């Protein structure tokens, strides 16, 4: 959520900054907010005046009664005054609801470093690590490898649940679990994160706090009749752990690493990378979430990207980093980097992690603040998160990049201690 004061003081600047954001967003609502805010402030001034008058007259009534004067007309006037105040209060509540409705649907303002552009083709590559894997034979796609090695069962996943669900079997299940353990160990013992195991269901306030609601409700799995949502990412429960709290500045930054299953309907994605493990309705992920002071947030973002990179480097998987352009930035981020792993079956890099600085956008929605000392006025914190990284896509990348001509798959050195085998065959 944006700062209403900033909108009030600089509406034209806000409209300009949001005009090429790439969201389905009409900047004209900024003018509506300014108009409503001005009306509300005028009403509040008037109400204060009326309440002052009512208090003054109310204090005089006992004196007039004691003096034997008739106060009938004065009492009638006070009742009318009370009705007037009540009507004003009703209008203020209506304005508040409308402003909140609009504010919850306004995307974040891009950082000046965000490149111009409309689609993912306009994202800017800033780094490459490793070289795309070369083969002396025709490599298989991970869905074929998984089927041939009897470690991924897409057919039975579809039978049990439907399209875009997968059953992991034998060494496939162990590979998934080994990667999870490796990521969590790396982030907690080397990168300084505290491990969190969060709930997989959250309430509407939590989904609103991190920005999934109201805009992306159609992409969420909702549990009917009780208001719960299955989490699309551990970012939601971990960020909302601190909702409506004022944190002490001396404990910042807070760094959490959370493994969870993630659930996404991904409406409108039919036909886009839906074969194999790349785009599933249910998948596992290790999420990195940070809470820090505003002046530290961009340095923390750089470190967050490095932490996400570290697990891919440990696995020896080639990747690149792109800075996301304005049109592809999404709703909540002020600045975002995608890490894309090389996927031979696609002959291109595929997103495996997004690392974002939301600045105070989520903190305003979730009301998360901090203060340096107990005497200081609380200020909104900055939140960041990044995939550290998506597990299913890592499984796919390992299978494809480490496959051998005989159809076996070598296990990366970093996870052999978890796998207890050198090859899947």
UniProtKB/Swiss-Prot annotation:
Q: Which pathway is recorded for this entry?
A: Aminoacyl-tRNA biosynthesis; selenocysteinyl-tRNA(Sec) biosynthesis; L-seryl-tRNA(Sec) from L-serine and tRNA(Sec): step 1/1
| Superkingdom in the source lineage | Bacteria
Q: Which GO terms describe its molecular function?
A: ATP binding; catalytic activity, acting on a protein; serine-tRNA ligase activity; transferase activity
Q: Which gene encodes it?
A: serS
PANTHER family recorded: SERINE--TRNA LIGASE, SERYL-TRNA SYNTHETASE
- Which Pfam families did the record assign? Seryl_tRNA_N, tRNA-synt_2b
Its Enzyme Commission number(s) read: 6.1.1.11
Return the SUPFAM superfamilies for the record: Class II aaRS and biotin synthetases (SSF55681), tRNA-binding arm (SSF46589)
Q: What is the role of the protein in this entry?
A: Catalyzes the attachment of serine to tRNA(Ser). Is also able to aminoacylate tRNA(Sec) with serine, to form the misacylated tRNA L-seryl-tRNA(Sec), which will be further converted into selenocysteinyl-tRNA(Sec).
Question: What is the protein's name according to its record?
Answer: Serine--tRNA ligase
Subunit info?
Homodimer. The tRNA molecule binds across the dimer.
